[in-house]
């Protein structure tokens, strides 16, 4: 009789240990997934691609340039994100078409996250008519659906009329 009681107690203990372990495992999984979500900037993702579709206007609201092109950003959640982009520009009548390449983005400081948008301040290289402009101050605002890239107008002769170039995330 003592043998049967020991076996029954051991069996109950095993069930208790298994149930307790399962509960600990589930709680630990929830804690880990919650902390991972906050680290990766609100689930923005580490790589994004998209297209530009921006209309530049003058101070009166008249369309001066139509901007289009492709962009790609990787390493978003790292200390050295990479931006590659081509911005094609043309007058509203289709004339004066040209393009700019953007690369060599270097992050300055830490990203700032507001309202599920990550803001990255840094510098990049942008090709212009007279050659590449290096260390061009660049601000990127990236969300799940949209990207805005702003270049300091001083070094590029106000080429983008002091406006961000906007696009969408594919």
Please provide the spans of the model-predicted regions.
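Extracytosolic low-complexity repeat regions of secreted or lipid-anchored proteins
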Residues: 121-128, 133-154
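Solvent-exposed loop and beta-edge segments used for protein-protein assembly and interaction
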Residues: 43-46, 77-79, 114-116, 132, ...
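Short, flexible beta-strand-to-coil junctions
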Residues: 53-58, 88-92, 152-154
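Generic recognition of long tandem-repeat/solenoid scaffolds
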Residues: 45, 50, 85, 120-122, ...
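Secretory targeting signatures
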Residues: 1-38
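N-terminal segment immediately downstream of the Sec signal-peptide cleavage site
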Residues: 37-82, 161-170
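Predominantly extracellular/secreted and cell-surface proteins with exposed
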Residues: 64-129
């Amino acid at each position: 009789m003592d043998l049967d009681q020991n076996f029954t107690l051991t069996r109950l203990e095993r069930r208790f240990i298994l149930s307790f372990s399962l509960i600990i495992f589930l709680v630990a999984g929830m804690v880990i997934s919650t902390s991972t979500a906050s680290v990766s900037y609100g689930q923005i993702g580490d790589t994004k691609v998209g297209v530009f579709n921006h209309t530049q206007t003058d101070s009166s609201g008249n369309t001066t340039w139509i901007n289009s092109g492709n962009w790609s950003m990787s390493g978003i959640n790292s200390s050295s994100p990479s931006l590659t982009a081509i911005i094609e520009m043309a007058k509203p009548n289709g004339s004066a078409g040209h393009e700019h390449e953007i690369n060599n983005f270097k992050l300055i400081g830490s990203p700032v996250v507001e309202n599920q948008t990550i803001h990255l301040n840094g510098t990049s290289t942008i090709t212009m008519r007279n050659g590449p402009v290096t260390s061009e101050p660049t601000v990127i605002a990236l969300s799940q659906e949209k990207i805005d890239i702003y270049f300091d107008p001083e070094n590029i002769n106000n080429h983008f009329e002091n406006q961000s170039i906007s696009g969408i995330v594919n």
